[in-house]
Amino acid sequence: MKTAYFDCFSGISGDMVLGALLDLGLPLDVLSGELKKIAVSGYVLSAERERRGSIAGTRVRIDIEDQPARSYREIARLIGESALESPVKEKSLAVFEKLALAEARVHQVPPGDVHFHEVGALDSILDIVGAAIGLHHLGIERLCASRVPLGGGFVETRHGLLPLPAPATVLLLEGVPVYDNGIQRELTTPTGAAILAALAESFGPVPDMVVRSTGYGVGTHPCADPPNLLRVLVGEASPGLLRRRLLLIETSIDDMNPEFYGHVMERLFDAGALDVNLVPAQMKKNRPAVILRVLLEPALQAAVTEIVFRETTSLGVRIQEVDRVELPREIGEVDTPYGRCRVKWVRTPWGERRATPEYEDCKRIALEQGVPIRRIYEEVLAAAGRGQ
């Protein structure tokens, strides 16, 4: 799986993403040609080599003439009606949706009414759609990122003096691991944060992969300590095993009606939790208790924590980052004398291919056919063995 890792040691912005993708081999004429498929005009796109400190990278410049303000609804229409390829449209719209939802929360307006003002509107369109074009052209199948530095200070805007990071940036990074590196300027822009929020699958250290190429996108600020660059590593995921950085949230409960645990588990799974465990424990004062453990993607931290506090008697949770090493898997179907059933296939590093019947399908078929679920499992495994 071709993976891009965004190393945001100096933050991230839309133009830095474009610069890094060009540095990785995206031809400028391809980028320009694809952007012309959107019905916008009044800009000149260029790129040049620049240094930040001792490191050279690609800096993108977009010179924009006076532009009208554009609403999120209008921008979505422009992208949807363009001749861009479907994967590019989907990624672009996903990023703009994240951005519009964040701006809507900041200004307390419906997302469709969010306006991107004048130059900023076109700049966002070119940065976001350009990033989607670059990822598609380079064949990136998975995007991961480092922790994100927030920056600090204040900036003068048309809305007055605003704190940094911008309010929309903070909302976009909910559920994303962030940190303060002490630099008092804008490091992560709303556009950069929206790209990560919409497209990054995980955040943390570099995933296991064989690095094939590296690109540097140069930011507008001339800062060289640390160098104002976005580094993007592109490589192939290491064969056989996949590594994901996840969160483990747990809490110990000794005073809740046990009938409620089933409901709590359903709520957590509905929210997107990857796994939920209930572990018996002995607490202080020799009270029997339950340790509730939830495995989840970092982006779901806020939602899962809220469910735990709303649905249980917990007064606090423990949160830790964990690495999950897993076998690659895919879902298929097999034919049995009782009907079709889904199967989860995994491939081990030593070449073994294993099949696991999908429980819900087996349960449904067993009830429909009036046969023991054990027999359905046996038939599914036999069919899977014949199909290997």
Swiss-Prot record:
* Keywords assigned by UniProt, alphabetized: Nickel
Origin: domain of life: Bacteria
Q: Is-annotated flag, keyword Cell membrane?
A: no
Identify the InterPro entries for this entry: Ni_insertion (IPR002822)
Gene Ontology molecular function: lyase activity; nickel cation binding
Pfam family name, one: Ni_insertion
Q: Which family does it belong to?
A: Belongs to the LarC family.
What the entry lists under NCBIfam families is as follows: nickel pincer cofactor biosynthesis protein LarC
**Would you tell me the protein name for this molecule?**
Putative nickel insertion protein
